[in-house]
Structure formats: C-alpha cells, structure tokens
C-alpha cells in the first residue's frame, strides 16, 4: 500500500519523505523498483519509528503524515507480541506525539479490518465492535485508540483507514489469493 501511495503522491506533484527501517542491504523495498522520475523525487530516510527523538526530528515541516509503519504478520504476533507492541503501539505513539508537537495538519492512521475480528453482522461498519483475535489485532486496536485520543485530547486532525483484503501489483506472496 505504501509504495503505491508514494508513487501516486509523487505523480500528483507532492513532496514525499518516507521513513524505512534500516537494513544491512540498504534496500528500499519496492522503492528500489521505481522508475528514476519517481525514485529521484523521494526523500528516503532510514530509521526506526520506536526512536522518539528521530521521529520528532524527521517530521518537522511535514504537512500530512500517512502512518503505515507496522509489523503485520498475524502468525508471528503470537511468537513475539512484545515486538508488535513496541512497533505498532509505541511507534504509533511516537508518530502521534511528533505530529502534535510539529503541528501536522493531518495524521492518517492505517489500520486493518483485523480490528473487528469475526464479523458479528454484515456489512461491517465503523460501529462494529472491536475484537482482538490476535496480538497483532490488539496492537492495531490500541494504535487506533491512541490516534482517536490525540484527536479528542489535543484536537490533532486524525483519519483512520481500515482496509480489507487488499490485493494487486506488488502484493506479498504471503497474502496471495489462491486460484
């Protein structure tokens, strides 16, 4: 989702800064595959959203934060729930606090349909009860609630997106739809 968002924002003429986790290969993930006219217009910064001072510094002079950083493997969340809390909850808190301190115009929180658990009614609406069926889902619920609290407590403009079963180009084979 993030690589498609970056591509679209660049094509619309926006300045884009993205934070990617440092890795030994210095890989930028899907950004490495972008055409030069897109890739050369992205400011890429390697770092960790769990580093509060780093995030505060890197979000200065930013108008909108699209927060997509998260650990997402549901099965692995059972093996390492602490890492999910650290990245998905504390990382989100760092992003929200930086947005507040740097007077960001809008904070877009990317969540997941997993926050609803098994559907209790169809169609699922925003009024559907939240039900964490995995440590991953619990961290995303916590992240969403933190975002809402920053709206309610600090009037930080927040938008929460909860995508369902995304698919398409650049899709991870982990989430491939069988044919």
Which role does the model predict for each range below?
Residues 1-166:
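N-terminal Rossmann-like NAD(P)+-binding domain of SDR-like oxidoreductases, especially those catalyzing
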Residues 141, 166-179:
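Glycine/proline-rich active-site loop of Rossmann-fold NAD(P)-dependent oxidoreductases
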């Amino acid at each position: 989702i993030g690589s498609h968002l970056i591509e679209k924002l660049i094509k619309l003429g926006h300045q884009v800064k993205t934070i990617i986790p440092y890795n030994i290969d210095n890989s930028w993930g899907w950004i490495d595959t972008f055409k030069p006219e897109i890739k050369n217009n992205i400011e890429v910064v390697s770092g960790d959203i769990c580093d509060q001072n780093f995030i505060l510094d890197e979000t200065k002079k930013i108008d909108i934060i699209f927060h997509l950083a998260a650990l997402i493997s549901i099965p692995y969340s059972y093996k390492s729930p602490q890492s999910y809390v650290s990245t998905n909850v504390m990382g989100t808190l760092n992003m929200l606090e930086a947005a507040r301190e740097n007077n960001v115009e809008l904070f877009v929180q990317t969540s997941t349909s997993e926050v609803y658990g098994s559907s209790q009614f169809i169609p699922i609406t925003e009024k559907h009860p939240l039900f964490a069926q995995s440590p991953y889902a619990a961290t995303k619920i916590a992240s969403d609630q933190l975002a809402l609290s920053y709206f309610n407590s600090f009037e930080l403009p927040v938008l929460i997106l909860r995508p369902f079963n995304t698919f398409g180009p650049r899709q991870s084979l982990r989430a491939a739809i069988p044919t």
